[in-house]
Amino acid sequence: MENFKHLPEPFRIRVIEPVKRTTREYREKAILNAGMNPFLLDSEDVFIDLLTDSGTGAITQEMQAAMFRGDEAYSGSRSYHALARAVKDIFGYEYTIPTHQGRGAEQIYIPVLIKKREKEKGLDRSKMVALSNYFFDTTQGHTQINCCVAKNVYTEEAFDTGVKADFKGNFDLEKLEQAILEAGPANVPYIVSTITCNSAGGQPVSIANLKAVYEIAQRYDIPVIMDSARFAENAYFIQQRERDYRNWSIEEITREAYKYADGLAMSAKKDAMVQMGGLLCFKDESFFDVYTECRTLCLVQEGFPTYGGLEGGAMERLAVGLYDGMRQDWLAYRINQVEYLVNGLEAIGVICQQAGGHAAFVDAGKLLPHIPADQFPAHALACELYKVAGIRAVEIGSLLLGRDPATGKQHPCPAELLRLTIPRATYTQTHMDFIIEAFEKVKANARNVKGLEFTYEPPVLRHFTARLKEKA
């Protein structure tokens, strides 16, 4: 199938879900009733749902078949052992705890690592600083509710939509080491390597960067956790862009990358393709004590450590999905679909972040320059896009970033982005063309889009349940 301009989807569609078409008047009422927050819309009122790729896509026939192998034993399930074997084979990690999703893993390992630092070093957690190339929102939230500061140390070009670079998700290594020294190494309970870097636009992190981060962390005795939601997409970018790995398979690159962390936390609802599931895993016996404490916390918060909130069939499906998500042809199709959308948007003058792995990120600050950051231009754009075309997208900007817990002031945001997240094997090229046409209509009316203000602001993860109204 070489030398074709566009390759079709590498699958056949066997089951479909009808969606309803709505009028502009209907959608205006719906978004108003939802408090100008797309998260609060009913899914039946959404024509194309680009809110997230987390558990919203299709699954493979092999994953569906695996459900019927499920062992629903409360403890010692053979389905757990199938999952643990897959983790060992793919990542090389010895110890596996299943969780209901990614934040289930976070609510276990984060307090354990912070408490471990307190106990061993006799430190005050309020002085601790956790570091990342960019924390995902729930990872940041769990860090903050455990009284620890979450700090991002990304590269200068990460959020510059005018710059193209192979690995815009990389850590700034100089800033990382500086942040460690400023906080004091003992006050850094963990470093999170987020691959791909969602908040920067699904941008990849190179193996060279992961290795350098791990070397710095080991020098200062700081554990590294890999936020692994999109591990396969990151491996694909490494294969395509990092010279030393161009002839490596996705499986080989994945195994190599995970040498440079001590543990992984995963929302398996992304690259592992399941509707529900997560993982918390540790590499070897050097983290056995942490693993043991995490198992205990899992008992309290998720369930017995050999099911962790998942039924046996779901663990079987996850074990298969980890492999299916690494298929070379599948990843090529998925990355090219995102690139097609980004290229189409830029062709009509809509500025985007460089095409990443799972979504197109529109620079809302440039499309709506008349709306200041504290009136949430990307969220305003999301509301307008829904009104125009029934498309639901999500803000990655000031609304998501939130306030400084100590001062209550809005965190400065490096970019105001609207994320158009593409669920796996769900939408076709025709859908991408419709999205591009919708943006033509939005762009033509951009100057009339209004900023937003709160009518209800939750204290944590406010973007999920906040209610807003248009500024007068």
From Swiss-Prot:
Q: Does the keyword Lyase apply?
A: yes
The chemistry this enzyme catalyses reads:
L-tryptophan + H2O = indole + pyruvate + NH4(+)
Question: EC no.?
Answer: 4.1.99.1
Organism domain of life: Bacteria
- Gene Ontology terms, MF aspect: tryptophanase activity
What positions are modified (N6-(pyridoxal phosphate)lysine)? K270
The answer, when asked if RNA-binding is one of the entry's keywords, is no
* InterPro entries (alphabetical): ArAA_b-elim_lyase/Thr_aldolase, Beta-eliminating_lyase, PyrdxlP-dep_Trfase, PyrdxlP-dep_Trfase_major, PyrdxlP-dep_Trfase_small, TNase, Tryptophanase_CS
The cofactor(s) it depends on are: pyridoxal 5'-phosphate
| Pathway in which this enzyme or protein is active | Amino-acid degradation; L-tryptophan degradation via pyruvate pathway; indole and pyruvate from L-tryptophan: step 1/1
> Keywords in UniProt for this one?
Lyase, Pyridoxal phosphate, Tryptophan catabolism
Return the similarity comment. Answer: Belongs to the beta-eliminating lyase family.
What quaternary structure, including any partners, is listed in this protein's UniProt entry? Homotetramer.
Q: What name has this protein been given in UniProt? A: Tryptophanase
Instruction: Name the gene behind this protein.
Output: tnaA
